[in-house]
């Protein structure tokens, strides 16, 4: 959802609205909310705005607990937990000055952990250009390991709780996302809203606005629309085995058209 261009609020609202649809479908089939609720998990993206992303994750955890308890009647704590995986935002990676992507990914990874993610994937610095090299993939992994074992960020749950700014931002995101979920409910739920192109249109509009803000220089992207380099080095890129590519294309063609 976020990689397609949604805002943080839209990602939060649309993701949880989808969750509501799945839970309701399971309950309609007679499943016990306290049993299957423990096994639900979500997938979130982490974008560039450090504190907004932390607040988004905090709001998600709070909102999902309320949804499971108030809307669906869950009574067990584990059935109300918002378990989620986070991937750093591939759409924020830039082809220019690719080493800058290491910094972007590090900040996104740190925000994910501070927000309470249970698992994490860090993108490699060269993924805006090609499949990552082994060195780039290892650096992305080491980013996670340094955050986990050297920074102290993971020593305590929700370390930014009580921060006036973070708490206010969390409340704001929750209120905006809740209002958007209510709008989806008015459209008949997530599935019906998708059929009416509601989510798609909202995401498309947000993606256009965000790209326009970069193109106009309103949103600064270091190395892209500000602090450019006139002597850009050609980075090492993963070499593709063209023979293997051709074989796979042949197999795919045979699968699609066996005759």
Positions of predicted regions on the chain:
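Metal- or metallocofactor-binding catalytic centers and their adjacent structured scaffolds
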Residues: 115
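Generic beta-strand/beta-sheet core signal
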Residues: 43-47, 85-89, 105, 122-125, ...
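Flexible, glycine/charged-enriched surface loops at secondary-structure junctions
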Residues: 28-38, 68-82, 119, 150-160, ...
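Flexible, glycine-rich loop/tail regions that form catalytic "lids" or insertion modules at the edges
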Residues: 134, 142-145, 149-259
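A broad, low-amplitude sensor of folded, mature protein cores
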Residues: 64, 118-119, 143, 258
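Helix-rich catalytic cores of soluble enzyme domains
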Residues: 1-111, 125-141
């Amino acid at each position: 959802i976020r990689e397609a261009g949604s805002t943080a609020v839209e990602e939060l609202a649309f993701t949880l609205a989808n969750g509501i649809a799945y839970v309701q479908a399971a309950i309609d089939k007679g499943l016990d909310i306290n049993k299957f609720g423990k096994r639900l998990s979500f997938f979130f993206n982490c974008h560039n705005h450090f504190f907004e992303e932390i607040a988004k994750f905090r709001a998600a955890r709070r909102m999902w607990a309320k949804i499971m308890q108030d809307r669906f009647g869950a009574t067990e704590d584990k059935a109300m937990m918002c378990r989620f995986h986070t991937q750093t935002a591939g759409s924020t990676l830039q082809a220019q000055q690719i080493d800058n992507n290491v910094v972007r990914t590090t900040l996104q990874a740190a925000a994910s952990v501070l927000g309470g993610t249970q698992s994490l994937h860090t993108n490699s610095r060269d993924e805006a250009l090609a499949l990552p090299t082994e060195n780039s993939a290892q650096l992305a992994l080491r980013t996670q390991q340094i955050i986990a074992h050297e920074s102290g960020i993971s020593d305590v749950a929700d370390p930014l709780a009580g921060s006036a700014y973070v708490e206010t931002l969390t409340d704001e995101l929750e209120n905006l996302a809740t209002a958007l979920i209510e709008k989806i409910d008015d459209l008949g739920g997530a599935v019906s809203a998708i059929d009416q192109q509601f989510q798609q249109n909202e995401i498309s509009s947000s993606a256009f606005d965000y790209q326009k803000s970069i193109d106009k220089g309103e949103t600064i992207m270091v190395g892209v629309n500000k602090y450019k380099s006139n002597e850009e080095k050609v980075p090492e890129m993963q070499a593709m085995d063209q023979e293997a590519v051709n074989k796979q294309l042949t197999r795919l063609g045979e699968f699609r058209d066996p005759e």
